[in-house]
């Protein structure tokens, strides 16, 4: 595909020798209004070079470049040179690339097979898989898809919270109040009841906390009874989690959680000792990070048990040895920023240069309309309940609007779950938000169902046409303003994917395909597609095909399926 910006940089650099290509590229802007052109060059910086007023320089540059085949019009407006793309060449370039690449339009082999680890979701064993987990789960899954699409080998790791003092608490609760048959039929809610009961009883009887610590130490020492109970709790939980992952269409390359790294702790602590990083503090081992404006990081408690941070360090070292990663990405809430800052710095101080390749991708907090979620108090919204409610609500809408639709159950699942994922990926990941049933399940505005419906509309037109796509004889039929706006958004899709990968921000893609859906629906409203004139019909169908391709790819990258009918 012709890169019009690159062509523009070449043209400008022929006229201005004092700046290099990169400097010129950084100067080029996109005008705020379409009527001002497709690109703009501000000439303020050239005043010192040419010893002339910027508006005179702009006028001279415009007169020299005018008449180029790639740009139909070049004009100066005050100190700016505005460039208007040749719409016919532009349409031909973009649409023929779509024809050539199909569903791989936008894919590039930037990664050349390099390994990128994306750690995401990572729920705690025996605790609810709640609405708060949706963000890490869908952001991580989208990033994995994006990196694979760009030629990396993305490895999805679910770093399960399957280790720690909470297992001591749960084992105590299980032994005192648990009913294994009840747990088997409904694991997570039953584990939650036990967890809540433990905390309620421990407030009255502090000895329970001591018993919990004792059980966790037995677990760390590989005591057979403790290990058997732990494995049973883990397996029951994982079975539940996988059911939700299946609903979301997500799988993982590894479920290696915290426990996987427990045997590696002594070597990690020994390496820190050898590097002179550890200090004693009240019987515990810490790394002093005051020099880096951070509080000390505790590596080992006074009773000899390890912490989350120790296991994260061990996991990173293991991953580097095993996968030789290019990037090691952690999709974890923004409240964990200090934790990651600390252990990234410790890895660096241990002499591992690859510490800079470990990246924390933070996201904002989710809270309920009446306050923050708390597992200890049992105030949670289960993610599975949210997904099922979304499916049910979608089914009601289908029954109301299209009762004769085939495969209603399947369509309701695709659209309902897609609505939840789309909602999570529409706004910038760093923003906190309050979870609202009404907003999440709304089927109006900038939503997943709107984009999915636009895709179905394009699919329906294409099915009716039976048209076999080939190069057009006349691309001037797609140079009107509405068609040009659609084609421009299609042309920006490949760079949108790259931008999303560089910023670890799937919402860039979500918003882009929403804008494409809007632009296409305006075009569709004003232009009949299946007209009698064969050439016009073929041109418009080609545009429909291009939109169909990009919407399907965009939704797929976000982890959202596309129904064939709605």
From Swiss-Prot:
SMART domains: Arg_tRNA_synt_N, DALR_1
Motif 'HIGH' region, chain ranges: 123-133
UniProt KW Isomerase keyword: no
Assembly mode: Monomer.
GO biological process: arginyl-tRNA aminoacylation
InterPro entries: aa-tRNA-synth_I_CS, Arg-tRNA-ligase, Arg-tRNA-synth_N, Arg-tRNA-synth_N_sf, ArgRS_core, DALR_anticod-bd, Rossmann-like_a/b/a_fold, tRNAsynth_Ia_anticodon-bd
PANTHER family recorded: ARGININE--TRNA LIGASE, CYTOPLASMIC, ARGINYL-TRNA SYNTHETASE
Catalytic reaction(s) noted: tRNA(Arg) + L-arginine + ATP = L-arginyl-tRNA(Arg) + AMP + diphosphate
CDD domains, sorted: Anticodon_Ia_Arg (cd07956), ArgRS_core (cd00671)
UniProt keyword list: Aminoacyl-tRNA synthetase, ATP-binding, Cytoplasm, Ligase, Nucleotide-binding, Protein biosynthesis
Name assigned to this protein: Arginine--tRNA ligase
HAMAP family, sorted: Arg_tRNA_synth
PROSITE patterns for the chain: AA_TRNA_LIGASE_I
This protein's GO CC annotations: cytoplasm
Enzyme Commission designation: 6.1.1.19
Species whose genome carries this gene: Halothermothrix orenii (strain H 168 / OCM 544 / DSM 9562)
Family, per entry: Belongs to the class-I aminoacyl-tRNA synthetase family.
Location in or out of the cell: Cytoplasm
Molecular function per GO: arginine-tRNA ligase activity; ATP binding
């Amino acid at each position: 595909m012709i890169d019009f910006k690159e062509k523009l940089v070449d043209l400008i650099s022929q006229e201005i020798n004092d700046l290099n290509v990169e400097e010129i590229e950084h100067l080029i802007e996109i005008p705020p209004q379409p009527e001002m052109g497709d690109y703009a060059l501000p000439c303020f910086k050239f005043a010192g070079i040419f010893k002339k007023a910027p508006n005179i320089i702009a006028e001279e540059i415009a007169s020299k470049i005018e008449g180029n085949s790639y740009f139909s019009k070049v004009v100066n407006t005050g100190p700016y040179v505005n460039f208007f793309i040749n719409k016919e060449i532009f349409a031909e370039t973009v649409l023929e690339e779509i024809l050539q690449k199909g569903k791989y339009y936008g894919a590039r082999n930037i990664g050349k097979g390099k390994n990128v680890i994306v750690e995401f979701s990572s729920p705690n064993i025996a605790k609810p898989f709640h609405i708060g987990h949706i963000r890490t789960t869908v952001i991580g899954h989208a990033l994995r898809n994006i990196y694979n699409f760009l030629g990396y080998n993305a490895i999805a790791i679910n770093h399960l919270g399957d280790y720690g003092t909470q297992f001591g608490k749960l084992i105590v609760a299980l032994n005192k109040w648990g009913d294994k048959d009840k747990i088997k039929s409904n694991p997570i809610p039953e584990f939650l009841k036990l967890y809540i009961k433990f905390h309620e009883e421990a407030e009255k009887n502090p000895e329970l906390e001591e018993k919990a610590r004792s059980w966790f130490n037995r677990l760390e020492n590989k005591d057979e009874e403790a290990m058997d109970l732990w494995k049973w709790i883990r397996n029951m939980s994982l079975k539940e989690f996988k059911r939700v992952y299946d609903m979301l269409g997500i799988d993982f390359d590894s479920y290696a959680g915290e426990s996987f790294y427990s045997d590696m702790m002594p070597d990690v602590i020994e390496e820190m000792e050898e590097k002179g990083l550890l200090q004693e503090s009240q019987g515990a081992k810490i790394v002093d990070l005051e020099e880096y404006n951070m509080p000390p990081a505790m590596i080992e408690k006074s009773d000899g048990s390890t912490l989350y941070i120790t296991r994260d360090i061990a996991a990173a070292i293991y991953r580097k040895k095993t996968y030789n990663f290019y990037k090691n990405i952690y999709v974890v809430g923004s409240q964990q920023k200090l934790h990651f800052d600390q252990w990234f710095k410790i890895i660096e101080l241990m002499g591992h240069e690859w510490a800079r390749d470990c990246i924390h991708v933070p996201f904002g907090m989710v809270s309920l309309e009446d306050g923050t979620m708390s597992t200890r108090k049992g105030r949670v919204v289960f993610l599975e309940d949210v997904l099922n409610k979304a499916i049910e609500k979608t089914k009601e809408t289908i029954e109301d609007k299209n009762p004769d639709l085939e495969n209603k159950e399947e369509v309701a699942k695709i659209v309902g779950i897609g609505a939840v994922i789309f909602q999570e990926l529409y706004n910038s990941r760093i923003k906190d938000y309050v979870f609202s049933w009404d907003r999440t399940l709304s089927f109006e505005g900038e939503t997943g169902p709107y984009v999915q419906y636009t895709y179905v509309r394009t699919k329906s037109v294409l099915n009716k046409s039976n048209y076999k796509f080939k190069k057009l004889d006349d691309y001037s039929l797609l140079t009107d303003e509405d068609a040009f706006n659609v084609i421009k958004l299609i042309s920006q899709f490949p760079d949108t994917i790259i931008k999303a990968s560089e910023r670890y921000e799937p919402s860039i893609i979500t918003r882009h395909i929403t804008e494409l859906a809007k632009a296409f629906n305006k075009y569709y409203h004003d232009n009949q597609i299946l007209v009698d004139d064969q050439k016009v019909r073929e041109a418009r169908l080609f545009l429909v095909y291009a939109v169909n391709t990009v919407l399907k790819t965009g939704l797929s990258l976000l982890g959202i399926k596309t129904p064939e009918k709605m």
